């Protein structure tokens, strides 16, 4: 790979993303596809761009990303986490701004398991008084 690149691993729910950043023109490639092609939802594209827009490096870095597992929202969150970690490796002075925005912390929320005797994780069967 290129000699002047930085790497970050991001995770969210059951998704895992590997992010490589290097100086360039702002091209974002996810699993060999453009950002706009990979994510149909505008919200997912916004989530991916958030850390770059915060530190104003949107058009100065090229991103090469591979992401596996989970759905659209989980993958977008994993990519955001990975980009954040790669940016901190690229320039440690960006850490306070990224931390203040809440991008550094790994979102530990997971799907709650279904319990025996219940319909879903918390949904109880309808109560019948008589």
UniProtKB/Swiss-Prot annotation:
Ribonucleoprotein as UniProt keyword: yes
Gene Ontology MF terms in the entry: RNA binding; structural constituent of ribosome
PROSITE patterns: RIBOSOMAL_S9
GO cellular component terms attached to this protein's record: cytosolic small ribosomal subunit
Record has Magnesium as a keyword: no
InterPro entries: Ribosomal_Su5_D2-typ_SF (IPR020568), Ribosomal_uS9 (IPR000754), Ribosomal_uS9_bac/plastid (IPR023035), Ribosomal_uS9_CS (IPR020574), Ribsml_uS5_D2-typ_fold_subgr (IPR014721)
Record keywords: Ribonucleoprotein, Ribosomal protein
Highest taxon of the lineage: Bacteria
GO terms, biological process: translation
Family: Belongs to the universal ribosomal protein uS9 family.
Protein name: Small ribosomal subunit protein uS9
Organism per entry: Haemophilus influenzae (strain PittEE)
Gene name for this UniProt entry: rpsI
């Amino acid at each position: 790979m290129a000699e002047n690149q930085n790497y970050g691993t991001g995770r969210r729910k059951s998704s895992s993303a590997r992010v490589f950043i290097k100086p360039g023109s702002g091209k974002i490639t996810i699993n060999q596809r453009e950002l706009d092609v990979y994510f149909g939802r505008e919200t997912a594209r916004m989530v991916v761009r958030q850390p770059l827009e915060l530190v104003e490096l949107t058009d100065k870095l090229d991103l090469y990303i591979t992401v596996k597992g989970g759905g659209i929202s989980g993958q977008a969150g994993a990519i955001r986490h990975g980009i954040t970690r790669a940016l901190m490796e690229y320039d440690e002075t960006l850490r306070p701004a990224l931390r203040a925005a809440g991008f550094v912390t790994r979102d530990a929320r997971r799907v709650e398991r279904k319990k025996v005797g219940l319909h879903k994780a918390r949904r109880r069967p309808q109560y019948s008084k008589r």
